Design a protein with these regions (language model features):
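Conserved glycine-rich cofactor-binding loop
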Residues: 10-11
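Rossmann-fold cofactor-recognition segment
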Residues: 45-60
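Conserved NAD(P)H cofactor-binding loop of Rossmann-fold oxidoreductase domains
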Residues: 82-88
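Short alpha-helical oligomerization interface
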Residues: 90-102
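Active-site helix of classical SDR
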Residues: 112, 148
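Residue(s) in the substrate-gating loop at a strand-loop-helix junction
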Residues: 132
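C-terminal helical subdomain
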Residues: 174, 187-224
């Protein structure tokens, strides 16, 4: 039986990923801040998974919780880092910005470090980080979120390079979704993907050990267009 941990499993992409992996027969470790939602999800899945509350803004406790989850689940093959927060910033607010940095940036680095340490000792494994197409866009209305996702994508690329250079049999998978129909996306957006379809593509890519996954597939062309388009032209639309 394959085993995976999902950090940020209480709603949206993480919740759907738990459902699809459970259906495939995975034994899961479900982690999130909202424990009541995790318990409800686990009940829906037959109460066969390990549930644990984690708050990525409490760094010491979060580190201990991840280590405990790994110890309880045993022989974990995949660790999926899905936790993230973000909304539009009509005014700059340091308290909000710090929350985004703590969860999206510091939390991901902390969880990745624990995961890498474990997989190095295990001599194999896969870290999956959920970034965003926002990593390639500097929006003035969501600048902290976009910057945090740019960090996520860059950090995972660096982690992948480190694993390859050290000849470690560890797969680093970066997932960059476009707009997915989840509670985090509160309004109708262009090319909105149903969460079931989006996660199905993610799971397929994860199981194929892909290093970079764009969701949905057309997002790859959007990213390519952004990279070749002059900045002055992009600014007309963002």
């Amino acid at each position: 039986m394959k085993k995976a941990i999902i950090v940020g499993a209480s709603s949206g992409i993480g919740e759907e990923m738990a459902k699809q992996l459970s259906e495939k027969g995975y034994q899961l470790g479900l982690m999130a801040r909202r424990i009541e939602l995790l318990n409800t999800l686990n009940d829906e899945l037959g109460s066969k998974h390990v549930v644990m509350q984690i708050d990525l803004q409490n760094f010491d406790d979060a580190e201990n919780k991840m280590k405990t989850m790994i110890s309880e689940l045993k022989d974990v093959e995949i660790i999926i880092l899905n936790s993230g927060i973000g909304t539009q910033e009509y005014q700059l607010n340091w308290k909000y910005q710090k929350q985004v940095i703590d969860v999206n940036v510091s939390g991901l680095v902390l969880m990745s470090t624990v995961a890498m340490d474990y997989f190095i000792k295990r001599e194999r494994g896969q870290i999956v980080g959920i970034s965003s197409i926002a990593a390639h866009i500097s929006s003035g209305l969501a600048l902290t979120y976009c910057a945090s996702k740019a960090f996520v994508s860059s950090y995972l690329n660096g982690l992948r390079s480190r694993a390859r250079r050290s000849k470690l049999p560890i797969t680093i998978t970066t997932i960059e979704p476009g707009y997915v129909d989840t509670p985090m996306v509160k309004s109708e957006m262009p090319w909105m993907a149903p969460v079931g379809k989006a996660v199905s593509q993610m799971v397929k890519g994860i199981e194929n050990l892909e290093q970079h996954i764009y969701i949905t597939k057309r997002v790859r062309w959007v990213v390519w267009f952004i990279k070749i388009t002059p900045n002055w032209l992009i600014r007309r639309f963002i």
